[in-house]
């Protein structure tokens, strides 16, 4: 999760508070219910520093020329990445576990858009070897076990197809938790719960963090070859008022890690 400094919470932004830290699989009730604040989150996502000027541009840059390519967006949310890919000529399909998010994506993309309510890590109602690319933007870190999700995404990709993804950076997560007074073991896979407040609504979200080698091992086990690992900067057109001080003075540690994987 990309945490902004305590002194940086622009209007419409998301404020966060670390609630708990655990290696247990069980989480609090109602956690990760994006449907409960879909509209508020989608509105913030449109213009926030983290999404509009950092993560989404980086994903589009890694995707590069997508004209004519069939792309599946896994965990599409309200569809901002899907729309950007379609505007670049891609033939797009998306799914999300939140029906509320899928409805917002349908309003954005139109009633004829290929959108599904489905959960990452469960079997998808899609045929084998269908897509040239799959994008997974900030979704894998909600899962304890990446194996089933990666295997299913590999199944729907054509041989040689690409999985383009972003996840929380394990180095940044470990540093944040240490600054919060916790004692995380870097080599462990563990989860933490944060309280998000956006537009006056407060929800609990749970994220799983794991070391870099656990990520790369999971990719290889699922039948992927790593072709790119990226830690991109923010875009140069970011409005200055959105830049946290630690970004402006170059003291910022990238909070997301990006990969391009090839289906082998």
Task: Please provide the spans of the model-predicted regions.
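Conserved class I S-adenosyl-L-methionine
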Residues: 5-67, 80, 84, 101-104, 163-194, ...
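Class I SAM-dependent methyltransferase SAM/SAH-binding core
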Residues: 72-74, 78-123
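A short acidic, Gly/Pro-enriched loop at the edge of an enzyme's catalytic core
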Residues: 124-133
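A short SAM/SAH-binding and catalytic strip from SAM-dependent methyltransferases
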Residues: 132-146
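A short glycine-rich, Lys/Arg-flanked "PGG" loop and its adjoining helix->strand segment in the class I
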Residues: 147-162
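Short alpha-helix
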Residues: 206-229
């Amino acid at each position: 999760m990309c945490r902004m400094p305590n002194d940086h919470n622009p209007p419409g932004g998301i404020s966060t508070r670390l609630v708990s830290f655990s290696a247990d699989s069980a989480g609090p009730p109602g956690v990760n219910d994006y449907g409960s604040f879909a509209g508020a989150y989608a509105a913030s996502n449109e213009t926030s520093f983290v999404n509009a000027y950092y993560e989404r541009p980086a994903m589009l840059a890694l995707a590069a020329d997508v004209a004519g390519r069939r792309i599946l967006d896994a965990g599409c949310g309200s569809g901002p990445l899907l729309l950007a890919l379609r505007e670049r000529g891609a033939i797009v399909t998306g799914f999300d576990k939140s029906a509320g998010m899928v409805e917002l994506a349908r309003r954005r993309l139109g009633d004829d858009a290929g959108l599904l309510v489905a959960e990452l890590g469960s079997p998808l109602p899609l045929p084998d070897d269908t897509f040239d690319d799959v994008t997974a933007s900030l979704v894998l870190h909600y899962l304890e076990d990446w194996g089933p999700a990666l295997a299913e995404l590999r199944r729907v990709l054509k041989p040689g197809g690409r999985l383009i993804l972003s996840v929380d950076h394990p180095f940044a997560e470990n540093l944040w938790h240490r600054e919060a007074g916790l004692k995380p073991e870097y080599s462990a896979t563990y989860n933490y719960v944060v309280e998000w407040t956006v537009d006056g609504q407060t929800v609990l979200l749970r994220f799983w963090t794991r070391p870099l080698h656990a990520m790369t091992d999971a990719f290889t086990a699922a039948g992927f070859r790593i072709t790119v690992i990226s830690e991109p900067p923010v875009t140069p057109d970011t409005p200055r008022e959105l830049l946290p001080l630690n970004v402006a003075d170059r003291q910022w540690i990238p909070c997301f890690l990006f990969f391009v994987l090839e289906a082998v």
